[in-house]
Amino acid sequence: MKIELDMYQTLALAVLVLMLGKFLRERVRLLDKFCIPAPVIGGVLFAIFTCICYVTGVAEFAFDDTLKEVCMVMFFTSVGFQANLKVLKSGGKAMIVFLGVVIVLIVSQNFLAVGLANLLDVDPLVGLCTGSIPMVGGHGTAGAFGPVLEDFGIKGATTLCTAAATYGLIAGSMMGGPLGKMLIERHHLLDTIVPEDDSLLVEEEIKHERHSSMYPAASFQLIIAMGIGTVLSKLLSLTGMTFPIYIGAMIAAACIRNLGEYGGKFTVYMGEINDIGGICLSLFLGMAMITLKIWQLAELALPLVVLLAGQTLFMILYVVLVVFNIMGHDYDAAVIVSGTCGFGMGATPNAMANMQAVCDKYSPSVKAYLLIPLVGSLFADFINSLVITVFINFI
């Protein structure tokens, strides 16, 4: 029996799955501890249900994912609005240095993924399913690039990317705090703590205050950026390279944001844009998760384990040997290490949870609380999308 859902029914089911995930996360402490997104919790359960139905021959589900693409583009447009060059400049040398460290991390994750895939004699694009797409990118980027890789002939790429992203969330949360603690105690870093000015954090918080009357204007800015983005995407396609559908919208949004910041002729309503983007991300993830075909993971189970183990070992070595030393070899650097594990293998909320755990035990770190969310949220996703696009087109 085949059960077909139109785009409205698919959206409604995604919302129900989202609500189920939120309900379970509020009641299962472990899910909340690891910051597992509500759409992932409910979506995995539904995907298991559809897998059982498929394997037993009871039913097969077919979904209309038209609205999934709309929500995906709107979310990544909101990410594009985060690319504020003024913030990058105000962060000073430390911001530039950390951004460079993150760029190297993104590129290295993909080189490692492709290299291990070649050693395992699997398609390099399968390797990319465990690279920076799910690691730095998380579930949002996994859901966006999975279909792109499927268009290149990688069956079940979305499922692979999502499985890797879920693993990354858990692994990044589990190792961030312990690594930070180890570095602090091994190198006696409490002696390196110095008082810092938190005015930049306060300034950003004020800028992102929400006003209900501004949500329509924020929506219009998002829609305009999406419209301009379609033109940019068509122009980019003339290069012969394959780009994700949202890349033009991200570039348009970044241009609008910086025109507003530097020109001063109009206001970009970032708080409201962030909220709308967050809603679209939840809906996009909900629809992406219910369409997972987890039975496609079976034949790639062993390569997937090896690829993810390689990424985990690399992350530990990278943050301890590179991030810690380049960022100052002090207490702040140790807290940054814990945060980098969070967003380098999962998402920025995991990074913040890791840092909070370390800071609650020892001392606050204004530097870490400034760098991690700004680089992790504002610039990492934007740069990651560009790097992934290059890898997909040239391997």
Summary of predicted features, one role per range:
Residues G115-V122, A165-V202, L313, L321-Y331, ...:
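Juxtamembrane and boundary regions of transmembrane helices in multi-pass small-molecule transporters
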Residues V70, N84-V114, S219-L222, D275, ...:
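Entry/N-cap segments of selected transmembrane alpha helices
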Residues L116-L160, Y167, L179, V194-P195, ...:
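Alpha-helical membrane segments and immediately flanking helix-loop junctions
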Residues T230-L308, F314, V319-I326, G339, ...:
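Membrane-embedded translocation segments of transport machinery
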Residues C51-V55, N110-N118, G143-L149, L283-Q296, ...:
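Hydrophobic alpha-helical transmembrane segments in multi-pass integral membrane proteins
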Residues K2-D65, F81-K86, E203-E205, A217-E272, ...:
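Structural signature of multi-pass alpha-helical membrane transport proteins
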Residues E69-V70, C161-P178, T242-A249, L307-F314, ...:
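Alpha-helical transmembrane segments
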Residues V40-T50, L99-F111, S132-G138, L200, ...:
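Small-residue-rich segments of transmembrane alpha-helices in multi-pass membrane proteins
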